[in-house]
Amino acid sequence: MEILNWQYGITYAILILTFLSSHEFGHYFAARYYGIQTTLPYYIPFPFPIALNFGTMGAVIRIKEPVTSKKALFDIGIAGPIAGFIVCCIFLIIGLETLPGKEYVYQIHPEYLQNGNGEIPMSGLYFGDTLLYSLFSKLFANPNGFLPPMNEIYHYPFLNVGWFGLFVTAMNLLPMGQLDGGHITYSIFGTKGHYAVSRAFFWLLLILGLLGAMYEWYLYLDETNATTILTGFGRSIYLFFQYFFAKFPILKGMWTGWLVWAILAKFVIRLKHPPVENEDDIGTTRKMLGIFALIMLLGSFSINAIYII
């Protein structure tokens, strides 16, 4: 089997392992600080050649004994996202500061020049834009240079891993169950406050996922000309979707995966957080860090995540 662009693959592998390690070792060292026994990170490979494959299903550590205080829970929960977030920001800055010209894309896709006028197609696999990615693009990319569209950034290891790492960080910071964001939210607001926030985010993800599924169904009907055979109620639903997505174009392209996440959160991760033994207040400094965690979540979250046009 011929292997092309192996140097970019090695760069990507090193970067993604660096991100995963920084996140998991953030948890690890915070747990060890409190004398809590924990394993070293387990890295989960995913080598199967499917359409959407980042080469890994992430990494995990296993905490071998209960966390007994809110302060320890908060510190362990937030250490991983902060460490991973910093690494991803560095990756994005490096990637944007060292962007090659448009000819780099043409080397990978010579057909863009051969079959057209050099314009990059608007179709393909897109990575959803985020507040942080947009901000960094304005701050660090050459304003007179070439900024690759979001359906081409997988050719740029630093941008790709930076985006992917922020996406993973955002998912971990969702304030639900025993995700990192759940630990943080529980430590700040307690059982009732955490459960209220957790339910709100469950409904948010469910709605986003359903909107994504609705739009995909609408596109399928439109592209296959199935609307010509729809009658009665089915055609009424199609016409409603047509009006709805024309009226609110921002709702197009929602990630259907949020529906999967909502189901996992409800039935696997669970929305509630188990209580800890010591529920003493975590103090003002940690609550300020909790606000920073919210900023990380909002800056890294993408409602359409990964989608195809």
Each language-model region and where it sits:
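Hydrophobic transmembrane alpha-helices and their immediate loop junctions
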Residues: 1-309
